[in-house]
Amino acid sequence: MWIPKDENPQTFPKKKIDTPMMMLSVFWGVNGIIAIDILQKPNTMNAQYLIDNVLTQIINSDEFEKSKQQKQKFAIHFDNSRVHKSHKVMNYLVENNVKVVPNPIYSPDIAPSDFYLFGTLKKRAEGREGDLENFVREQFEQFSHDDLKRVFQAWIDRCERVIESNGDYI
C-alpha cells in the first residue's frame, strides 16, 4: 500500500511470539465433558501419557460408570493417529471394555470435536490470556444437551456422506 511522503504508515500490533503452544484433548458426550487434558510444549503425546492423563479420566468418569451399570460397552472415537492406534492404548481400552468407534483412514476432518466444536472454542478464546482449562470447561458448560446432540447428529450425517462418497474428500 502506497502512502504520501508526509504521512506515517499505519502500525499493526505483532502477535506474541512467546505464546506457549499446547495440545488440548477433550472427550465429551451429550451430557458434557468426560475428560480434558492440556499438554504443554515441549512435551509430546505418547501412548503412556494418553493412558495416564486422558484415558484414566475417562475410565474414572461418571459416564463410564453409568455404562458399566447399564451393562453397555462404553464407546470412544478418535482419529487415526499413531498414539491412538498403538498396541499399548488398544490393549488398555480392551482391558477396560471400551469400544473404539472406527474412523475412516484418510478422513481426519470428521472428528466431531475438530470439525464442530474446536472452531467455536478457538473464536471465543482469541486474544484471551489466562487459565485455558477453566475457560474450556466454562465454554463446554454453555453448550446445551441439545447442542451436543446436534453435533453428534451432524457427525453421523458427515460420516454417512464419507461412506456414500467411497471415502473421497467431501
Each predicted region: which residue ranges?
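Extended, low-complexity cationic-aromatic segments
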Residues: 1-57, 61, 166
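RNase H-like polynucleotidyl transferase catalytic core
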Residues: 12, 77-80, 94-112
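Intrinsically disordered, low-complexity regulatory regions enriched in Ser/Pro/Gly/Thr
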Residues: 16-21, 27, 67-70, 92-95, ...
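C-terminal catalytic core of Y-nucleophile DNA break-rejoin enzymes
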Residues: 48, 81-84
